[in-house]
């Protein structure tokens, strides 16, 4: 009887060793034992823990989270909806402008164009004076400055039309050209109408266009730099401007701090719309 039990234990032990051996061989062949695999598992667990309390607002028409590294959507809801584009219109304006001007070009902001900015707008609080194109774009991206969007539109239109037009005519010209660009560039589901800042309630877009333009702009270092900080400052002849980022995920005092980032130091970069 004792011999029988001992034999069973030996068989069980050998079986366990055999299973362990097969498992090790399998892990080796599939590469699962490698650090990269473990790192990938960690990233997935970390992302799930970071987003398990993520609640999509009930009135949100569409919502997406895109994994830049894996080139895939993690969330994609509201494909059939055309949400009001709002401040995301600035992304399309910047994309268009980058083909028209250089980042170090000087933009003359005047009081006439500042007075066109719709009441109640989010502002970079620009003063009349000189700024670089790069600074104007940063003012559009960080505090979502509608005044900066109007200044950029005015500058580009005036460069092309020359002197002799009103600020309204310059803005109208810019929007006509921008609308044509959107069609040519394949942003077929975006209509910005008559406002470069996104203040028009008629303007709408689609997740596909929004994510595409966001990913395109993230190829620019200055874009990644300015949107990756909770506060951002520029030095101009008018003085220093410091803006608070409208992205609450970057605000240490926000309950959403570090939950999702447009760009992050980790291997996983996530772009959220």
Positions of predicted regions on the chain:
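N-terminal non-cleavable signal-anchor helices
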Residues: 15-25, 271
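Short Pro/Gly-enriched beta-strand edge/turn motifs at strand-loop
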Residues: 45-48, 252-261
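Active-site-adjacent loops and short helices of periplasmic peptidoglycan-processing enzymes
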Residues: 33-208, 217-218
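Secretory/export targeting leaders with adjacent low-complexity proregions
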Residues: 201-215, 234-239, 246
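N-terminal Sec-pathway targeting helices
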Residues: 2-18
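Conserved small/polar residues in nucleotide/adenosyl-binding loops
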Residues: 262-269
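Membrane-interface motif at the C-terminal end of an N-terminal transmembrane signal
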Residues: 23-36
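Conserved active-site loop region of the serine DD-peptidase/beta-lactamase
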Residues: 219-254
């Amino acid at each position: 009887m004792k011999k029988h039990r001992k034999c069973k234990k030996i068989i069980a032990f050998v079986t366990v060793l055999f299973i362990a051996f097969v498992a090790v061989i399998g892990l080796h062949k599939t590469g699962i034992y490698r650090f990269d695999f473990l790192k990938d598992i960690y990233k997935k667990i970390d992302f799930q823990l970071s987003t398990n309390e993520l609640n999509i607002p009930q009135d949100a028409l569409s919502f997406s989270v895109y994994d830049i590294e894996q080139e895939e959507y993690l969330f994609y809801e509201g494909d059939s909806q055309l949400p009001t584009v709002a401040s995301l219109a600035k992304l399309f304006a910047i994309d268009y402008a980058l083909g028209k001007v250089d980042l170090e070009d000087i933009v003359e902001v005047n009081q006439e164009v500042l007075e066109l900015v719709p009441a109640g707008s989010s502002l970079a609080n620009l003063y009349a004076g000189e700024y670089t194109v790069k600074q104007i774009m940063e003012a559009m991206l960080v505090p979502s400055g509608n005044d900066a969007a109007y200044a950029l539109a005015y500058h580009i239109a005036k460069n092309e039309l020359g002197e002799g037009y009103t600020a309204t005519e310059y803005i109208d010209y810019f929007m006509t050209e921008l609308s044509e660009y959107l069609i040519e560039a394949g942003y077929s589901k975006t209509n910005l109408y008559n406002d470069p800042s996104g203040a028009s309630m008629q303007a709408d877009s689609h997740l596909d266009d929004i994510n595409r333009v966001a990913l395109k702009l993230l190829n620019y270092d200055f874009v990644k730099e300015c949107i990756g900080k909770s506060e951002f400052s520029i030095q101009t002849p008018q003085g220093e401007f410091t803006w608070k980022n409208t992205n609450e995920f970057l605000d240490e005092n926000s309950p959403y701090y570090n939950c999702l980032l447009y760009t992050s130091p980790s291997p996983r970069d996530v772009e959220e719309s």
